[in-house]
Amino acid sequence: MNRNNQNEYEVIDAPHCGCPADDVVKYPLTDDPNAGLQNMNYKEYLQTYGGDYTDPLINPNLSVSGKDVIQVGINIVGRLLSFFGFPFSSQWVTVYTYLLNSLWPDDENSVWDAFMERVEELIDQKISEAVKGRALDDLTGLQYNYNLYVEALDEWLNRPNGARASLVSQRFNILDSLFTQFMPSFGSGPGSQNYATILLPVYAQAANLHLLLLKDADIYGARWGLNQTQIDQFHSRQQSLTQTYTNHCVTAYNDGLAELRGTTAESWFKYNQYRREMTLTAMDLVALFPYYNLRQYPDGTNPQLTREVYTDPIAFDPLEQPTTQLCRSWYINPAFRNHLNFSVLENSLIRPPHLFERLSNLQILVNYQTNGSAWRGSRVRYHYLHSSIIQEKSYGLLSDPVGANINVQNNDIYQIISQVSNFASPVGSSYSVWDTNFYLSSGQVSGISGYTQQGIPAVCLQQRNSTDELPSLNPEGDIIRNYSHRLSHITQYRFQATQSGSPSTVSANLPTCVWTHRDVDLDNTITANQITQLPLVKAYELSSGATVVKGPGFTGGDVIRRTNTGGFGAIRVSVTGPLTQRYRIRFRYASTIDFDFFVTRGGTTINNFRFTRTMNRGQESRYESYRTVEFTTPFNFTQSQDIIRTSIQGLSGNGEVYLDRIEIIPVNPAREAEEDLEAAKKAARQNLFTRTRDGLQVNVTDYQVDQAANLVSCLSDEQYGHDKKMLLEAVRAAKRLSRERNLLQDPDFNTINSTEENGWKASNGVTISEGGPFFKGRALQLASARENYPTYIYQKVDASVLKPYTRYRLDGFVKSSQDLEIDLIHYHKVHLVKNVPDNLVSDTYSDGSCSGMNRCEEQQMVNAQLETEHHHPMDCCEAAQTHEFSSYINTGDLNASVDQGIWVVLKVRTTDGYATLGNLELVEVGPLSGESLEREQRDNAKWNAELGRKRAEIDRVYLAAKQAINHLFVDYQDQQLNPEIGLAEINEASNLVESISGVYSDTLLQIPGINYEIYTELSDRLQQASYLYTSRNAVQNGDFNSGLDSWNTTTDASVQQDGNMHFLVLSHWDAQVSQQLRVNPNCKYVLRVTARKVGGGDGYVTIRDGAHHQETLTFNACDYDVNGTYVNDNSYITEEVVFYPETKHMWVEVSESEGSFYIDSIEFIETQE
């Protein structure tokens, strides 16, 4: 359309009226955009710019049939495929108009009604009138409001100003809200979900309209006045709804298949019809949902629908069944009941998944009869894309002569018209195919002919036309220009048998045509101006060990699976752009296991990276099971015909890897530089700071600040020098704010195990690494534990810097770890375990700098990996594998009587564990409120009550232990031991001290508990008593804590242990233990022995000096204690005797007469007169 001698491509947003264009901004374009539209076939028809082709292809004055809704489904998909090949622009307004006119051709709901009626017919089930009425009413509301939105959008695009922008934004929001409200009426809500299968085409078409709408927020949102946060929210909703809508459609589709799966030929016929028609009206559309992601496909792309559809077998099937037994549809003929069933037809006519094929040659084998040539066999020759190897499949009777030899070569067979019959008589029934014409895109018509109508009633004859089931894109125009599918294969099932108990015979020949979408690019063309889709099934070669398997329903075709190390296949591509053009590779996969992915071009590895699993083994594939990831290292092709191979290595166990497609993305340095600048601005300004720019957003982590700094550092100095300078100032300010709010001391790990009270305390095995590709600052490395000695590092955040009833968050980044335990301890503990795979392996190479790494490309790759973690729904096990982590803990009332800080503990307790992590920070999130505050107050009150109870108990134990220790000394300074006490009293006091609980943290023994101070006080005094006791005892190792050191023994003597108690055991009458002592002659000594005798006989402890003076303490089982109480075999008693040695050398000897003798301690101490 021209106005004032101006072409539309010269003026963006040119108004369509004749009024002055005062508010139109003119932009000169370097290239005529029409140049890219030359030499187009049916897409030229679809892409025409005027309004001529926004009208429906269904006559609104006629009723809408089942074939019509198939026509609508094919046309909508074809229209979208055409427009996906161009950048998103105002041209999409014509798509809106086309879709609305196609779905509401008469401004009524006849098409939507026909969608439901067709599925009702296929599955033989009726939808509730109430559900149907509600759905149609809601569709009417959507139509009205969609028209209002498109009208406002078109007016704003042609005459942009603030008022029109406000109006279109308002109508956008209203329409989005209505879709959110009405979508449950189409099969996902509680009132309609029982009819989800019947409503599947309705749901898919409505979902498509909603996702198509949401993409406009990315295209126009900023010009409407939306801020970036609002635009991002719409984008996130678009992605989330893509997942929701896709999963619903796949479930409804599969439920319908399961419901139709039966045992008879008729059930198979309906099953195949449902499979084909739901593919054309719903599932093809679902496969296009991801391509509305403007951020992923900014320059357009070429979606490839590689799926196959099977038209009905070419056999007699009248629209109305006769009342007689003659001339009935083949699948309900009772004579075939014993020969045709569901499984026979499915296994004979439907091929297993395979690589995408192109038909090369077709031979029809015929039997010449009086009626003409009957089709009885087929030879199908085909090849994989860009393969010179011809494959061949044969079906039916192969001994018959060739009636037609059709060389397809580089043409398409787009239509097949056949004459079919059911010759029925008392002697048998036969279904035959006679005249058949194959229409080629070259204009040639080939086939078998010569049929004469002899002996067959007209009612038993029928013409079958493939376009009745696969309509062309424009039924009013030439099919040769507008066909939608091309023939890719013909399967066939033929049988002939004699009926049981009858001389009559039955026979049938059932050729079945297999079709692929015409839009599939048969050359795998790589262009320099848009993203190229390469489904892996378009390979010319399948690697050994790789298997083509049925797709999950939303990929538009089958996928390739691999369960071990090796390749997937090889794709030959045709490069049309200059060989200097650089590209990047993106691919879509699902996996139950971690793996290394390799891409080679012409034998040279261009990318490799380690990727993580996306689902659990045995789990059903859903939309979220498939992940799209991108390599950052660019490459270029070296020849116009090149080969891309993909393979996997380094599988972490048994599992499955599914590969859907790879995408070839042209690198546009200028645009990517602009995108880098916008990403840096977003990271440095919008994502870090609060609105007032005086603080960091609460959810921002120190790691994110560092990564924002990396993004800014990677900006070009030449192009964006000023922007870079300002953004660097911003991220430096953000880093300072990050440090100021961090409650951890020394977050850079400059000093460990310092003498300061707080700060980092660590065990052996903790090292600090400097720099590296994953951390801008220092990082911690924790080695594996040694037997019972964990590797740990911890720090206490003092209570003085904390606030009561406030939430705090520990953030960090883990490069990789195994069995890393992260604990936050306050009055309660928050425990986190991280098992993070070492999958951040770069596919980049050195940039020649002294650091030896290209941090810019490195960061892009890391960000791509982290992006999958952020958007992939995870269970608790998967969350433990994420690199970034945050752990939250709430404070209570900060009871002043307890030293309530927050302990941050990192440890590895296993011998095969390890960890590398950094960017640790403990930050205040904010005060608790509402239910969180009430819950914390209740928990804190319970803890305080329990603390009071424990303290009362500990106070009782503390008082008893303190009194027992006081009794050990004769002075207040604990410098002199009470001469009356012995080891038994010390052990008794020790047992009381050890009964104090809460001395150390359960997490790490190096962390003191709430009773650590009183325990330390008593332990120090007890240690003093033990020292004084050992010092005064002339007997060395008299408590046997060092085994038999210092003692002379026979073989029948040993030292045993019971808890903290060691005791000497003599278990035979000839056992003997002795020790020589040095003493002060003529001084008073006391020999004190604590022991017990078991069994008969006596036990003896004898002391003697060099003058042959001696004293003996005797123990037996009949001993009484000092109070006259009987002592049993399990009780120890203490005996003592005074001795005045006359020489400085003495000897102590231990022996027994029979039984066993247990000695707890032997003392020989000097006492005051």
Curated annotation (Swiss-Prot):
Family assignment from sequence similarity: Belongs to the delta endotoxin family.
Its recorded name reads Pesticidal crystal protein Cry9Da
Q: Does the keyword Ribonucleoprotein apply?
A: no
Q: What does this protein do?
A: Promotes colloidosmotic lysis by binding to the midgut epithelial cells of insects.
What GO molecular function terms would the record report? Answer: signaling receptor binding; toxin activity
* Cystine residue pairs: none
Q: Which organism is it from?
A: Bacillus thuringiensis subsp. japonensis
Q: Which residues form a coiled coil?
A: none
